[in-house]
């Protein structure tokens, strides 16, 4: 895939539980990831437990986002993702009150604030 994500194509809208609606730009699928731009953020989603995290974490790294995004600075290991084969992997990031975990994307298992994050539903994550 390209080194640059094409986020210039309108991809619809996303509506949050709060009722707020934002435009979605782009729609790129990489493995189990869906990547898109919402507002001024690059976001993605993946359905647990269908995740091979060791591979997918690395795959997102080549995206170069030439805009300034608000970084996420709180990082800690605070959960475990269960895979279909019953193996598990530590989750880094932090939980929010809306029952999603926001993860900071980086290469490999070590995550840090690069201003790009993903939201995962918590139903398949155990602390």
Feature map (PLM): residue ranges:
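Extracellular jelly-roll beta-sandwich "head" domains, especially the C-terminal globular C1q domain
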Residues: 29, 47-63, 72-127
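Glycine-rich, low-complexity segments
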Residues: 1-28, 112, 123, 127
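Terminal low-complexity, poorly structured segments
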Residues: 21-24, 34, 107, 118
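Short amphipathic beta-strand and strand-loop transition segments with alternating hydrophobic
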Residues: 30-37
């Amino acid at each position: 895939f390209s080194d640059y994500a094409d986020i210039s194509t309108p991809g619809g809208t996303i509506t949050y539980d709060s009722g707020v609606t934002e435009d979605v730009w782009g729609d790129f699928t990489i493995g189990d990831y869906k990547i898109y731009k919402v507002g001024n953020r690059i976001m993605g989603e993946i359905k647990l437990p269908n995740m091979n995290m060791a591979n997918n974490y690395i795959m997102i790294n080549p995206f170069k986002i030439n805009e300034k995004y608000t970084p996420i600075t709180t990082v800690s290991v605070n959960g475990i993702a269960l895979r279909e084969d019953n193996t598990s992997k530590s989750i880094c990031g932090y939980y929010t009150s809306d029952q999603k975990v926001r993860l900071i994307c980086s290469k490999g298992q070590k995550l840090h604030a690069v201003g790009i994050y993903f939201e995962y539903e918590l139903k398949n994550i155990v602390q």
